[in-house]
Design a protein with these regions (language model features):
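Jelly-roll (double-stranded beta-helix
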Residues: 1-205
């Protein structure tokens, strides 16, 4: 229902993204990077785009990355909302235990979102996971190529809009502009305001 709102751009600088560092009873660390969605004990996440599903409290959206030392344990808290869907992607490390289940290879795991889960890095190397969760939007979906709307009529209108204006016009003189070869970290916002950050900024800066 928010597909026709004004576009919005936010740069989430790595060093500004909040993190929770948890040391278990043995002193082994789990670091949770909070890209979106509140995590108990962590600083508040950065603001999502104002009309996104992540900005709606009922969306219960979370995007967290986990890095666990060998042997580390951390309890993933239950999601807030009933009906929230939750996926845990294990993609770096040797082995992971989720509750009573041992996972000996990289995998995508759908977890029951309404309960806590004890996670244990049972491998000999650091482990990394990505957690994605949210409430289903529960609206009709129509899709064609890169266009996603709610009805076929909206798909046709979006295609016509793109053919006519390329969604507002293409302001560059060619189809493949580049930003140059120098190493820079910058963001350019609507109105041409530009923000630049150090290439080696410390986390928390």
């Amino acid at each position: 229902k928010h597909k026709m709102v004004e576009p919005h751009f936010t740069m989430l600088w790595n060093e500004r993204i909040p993190r929770l560092v948890h040391n278990d009873d043995a002193g082994r660390a789990t670091t949770v990077t909070v890209v979106a969605g509140a995590l108990p004990g962590a600083p508040a996440p950065l603001s999502p785009p104002p009309e996104s599903w992540a900005s709606q409290p009922e969306g219960d959206v979370a995007i967290w990355t986990l890095r666990m030392d060998p042997g580390a344990q951390w309890t993933l808290p239950a999601a807030r909302g009933q009906g929230t869907r939750r996926m845990l992607y294990f993609f770096v490390g040797d082995s992971l235990r989720v509750g009573p289940q041992d996972v000996g290879q990289h995998a995508a795991l759908e977890l029951v979102a309404g309960q806590d889960w004890l996670l244990t890095n049972t491998g000999a190397t650091p482990l990394e996971c990505l957690l994605l969760q949210g409430q289903p939007i529960a609206e009709p979906v129509a899709q064609y190529g890169p266009f996603v709307m709610n009805t076929q009529a909206e798909i046709m209108q979006a295609m016509n809009d793109y053919r006519r204006t390329q969604f507002g016009g293409w302001p560059w003189p060619d189809q493949d502009p580049v930003h140059g070869t120098e190493a820079r970290r910058f963001a350019r916002y609507p109105g041409q305001r530009e923000e630049e950050r150090p290439t080696e900024a410390p986390v928390g800066a």
